[in-house]
């Protein structure tokens, strides 16, 4: 089966995806499809490093601002909407360029229906659930949560089987489908995805991350979180558990000072970048590009036009 070709530019946070993707899109009449699990949310702009109108520079962007902050958004829903965007872009004679660092979104597109397996994994969700299990009556609360969304799996699991309960809840949060009803058969991807991943020296990346956090704070990150809470967005909803938001909430409640908050913002973002790179190394047939090098764009240009992986 001949499948239509799509290009994917991925990489950890602060690796330079936005600038390089805009340059590539302008050169090849591309429209960008966002592949970021946080930029889908409206009103969450600063903490998600959402590209500004100026940064977009006239390039159409899709899959940004498609959900409210208090709305649950599954990877299955992303897959369906992103594929519809790609098909529409191609139908208009343009090319789709997917850009973002959410690995399980890419996996779901490249391996459709494999949502109950490796494609559905998010360490931040897992860590949250595992922490809950350590609290008073945590195992019981975890089991009750599972029973509400997936009674069949809950009935099969012993109260002490925390690992499987966490896994089942993780899959449900990511896919919107109970673990017991996850499809078992993987189908062919609708499109062929050609992937390039940005990287750079770790110390340089971490320095860029710290500067980005400082810039976000200067741009009004604290005020953005305060505004979301004032509008009634629950502090414990999926979107507010994201890095850049969950650290600010205790600060606004007077439960931590700014020194600790700033430290956690930078530490958690560095850890997130490390997890992103770990995930991306699992992908096959990927061009790795050091975005700090002068020839980074030229390598991407060659990859785009010739399919070069060297």
Located regions from the model:
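Phosphate/pyrophosphate-binding catalytic cores of soluble transferases and nucleic-acid-acting enzymes
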Residues: 1-310
